[in-house]
Structures are given as C-alpha cells and as structure tokens.
Amino acid sequence: MYKIMWLLKRKPGTTHDHFRHHYETSHSVLGQKYFGHLIQSYQRNYNTAREQDGGGARASDYDCVTIWEMPDAELVDEIYRIMADPVIGPIFLEDESHFLDSSETRLVRCDTRDTGPGDGAEWFRHLASAR
C-alpha cells in the first residue's frame, strides 16, 4: 500500500467551519471527479485539538491531514499528470484559493507497513507477571 499525506492549513481569515465546508463540498468533489478512479481511499482528517493535549505534545498548526491510499507509487505519477493538464490544473488552483494556504501545504509520501492491531496477549502477560 502506498500513501500520500497532505498537511493543509486554511487561508488566513478563513474559519475552521468554512475551510471544512469548502473542502468537503467542492475540493474533494473535484478530486473524486478527476482522479478518484486511481485511489482506493481519500480521507480528510480534521484537526480537533486547538491547544496542547496530554503528554506534552504541542497541537499541530495544520487544519487537516488528507490521506490518499493507492496500490502503488506509479499511480501518483498519473495523478500528477492529470493535475498538470492545462485545463484541469487551473480548476484546482482556483478552488484552492477559496480556502487553502497553499504556501503552507506539505506533502509526505509513505510506503506503508501495517503490523495489525495485535491481540493484547503481551500486555496481559506483563500484568500477570507484575502481581
């Protein structure tokens, strides 16, 4: 499985609600229209933490982490080819100007490995030996 993670910030002056609404009703719809056939999953994960959570971790400055999942990296090249189209590319750029601070967008390419959830047996052995 191959993943692309987009770290996204809203445009200055844009509320969280407007950012989310525009992304869900316009930008993600464009993504589905033009390259939805190439991806297995298109997730938008909105930041709900606005201040430091427990454990000392600082809240992220990003408003959304978008994740595309696909079987292999070659499909990313096809998406980039579509986005470079002289008709399609400007459609996305114009739409982004309504809600996204593109200068702050970050891209993370991931070659994903999943160990699964586990069965918890090791934790229970640890608890039993602590008694």
Language model segments and positions:
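Macromolecular interaction modules
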Residues: 1-131
